[in-house]
Amino acid sequence: MEKYHGLEKIGEGTYGVVYKAQNNYGETFALKKIRLEKEDEGIPSTAIREISILKELKHSNIVKLYDVIHTKKRLILVFEHLDQDLKKLLDVCDGGLESVTAKSFLLQLLSGIAYCHEHRVLHRDLKPQNLLINREGELKIADFGLARAFGIPVRKYTHEVVTLWYRAPDILMGSKKYSTPIDMWSVGCIFAEMVNGRPLFPGVSETDQLMRIFRILGTPNSENWPNVTELPKYDPDFMVYEPLPWETFLKGLDDTGIDLLSKMLRLDPNQRITAKQALEHAYFKESN
């Protein structure tokens, strides 16, 4: 820690406190001080292993992890620092982003996700707060792999409930076999939010979250989602909803954009488009 000075607390994330600091050369970094659940046991070896994988991820759309400092009691991750995140931008952009901006951010998000999925790393906690942006319009994904290294928490460090808004229905219904499709669901939710300017499924509990999803996309059954009835939290008494036409809840997205989003937000994870496939979609071939 001696290398870094001028510590300024800039946030409390899901896993601990984030500081802005400078090194002796005047370069700015984001220091993420990880709170360990059981401090007496030290850092779990699984976390160390995951973090070492993160150091190997090198992509222009992923926040770079420069250094890992660990003592017996704490773990500090040294990341590149960016000034703003997508949530803050959406908060001030009433009615959503311009279509060219939304498309650029989505393309960058998918590029970073595709790279990580190719390297067998899941994010598991994608949301606008984890997407950092700079003045040049570059988007970088933060907190990659931390959900796996430290477990997806139920509450934030500040005792806020972790948002469920971007969580896939298979996870909400207790699936333990999750893979890359859970990230693609989150990407779809973020895409819709960039276009609409507000969250698509702002649930207040796991049950409410599922019902909000079903009210828009329809209630799943064995025909459109094989084996859904075997999920631990599937309820045969779920209210039955028919899917709504996409145009009714998406403003300002053309047909190719709707087609791409519909492939991201498939209820059945096995039917969801992959990041690599999404990058090849016609939506990115057309000019605005």
From Swiss-Prot:
It comes from the Eukaryota. InterPro entries: CDK, Kinase-like_dom_sf, Prot_kinase_dom, Protein_kinase_ATP_BS, Ser/Thr_kinase_AS. Pfam families: Pkinase (PF00069). ATP binds at I10, G11, E12, G13, T14, Y15, G16, V17, V18, K32. It is found in: Cytoplasm. Keywords: ATP-binding, Cell cycle, Cell division, Cytoplasm, Kinase, Magnesium, Metal-binding, Mitosis, Nucleotide-binding, Phosphoprotein, Serine/threonine-protein kinase, Transferase. The active site is at D125 (proton acceptor). Its cofactor is Mg(2+). It catalyses: L-seryl-[protein] + ATP = O-phospho-L-seryl-[protein] + ADP + H(+); L-threonyl-[protein] + ATP = O-phospho-L-threonyl-[protein] + ADP + H(+); [DNA-directed RNA polymerase] + ATP = phospho-[DNA-directed RNA polymerase] + ADP + H(+). Phosphorylation at Thr-14 or Tyr-15 inactivates the enzyme, while phosphorylation at Thr-158 activates it. One of its GO terms (cellular component) is cytoplasm. GO terms for biological process: cell division. Residues 4-284 form the Protein kinase domain. The modification Phosphothreonine is found at T14, T158. May form a complex composed of at least the catalytic subunit CRK2 and a cyclin. This is Cyclin-dependent kinase 2 homolog.
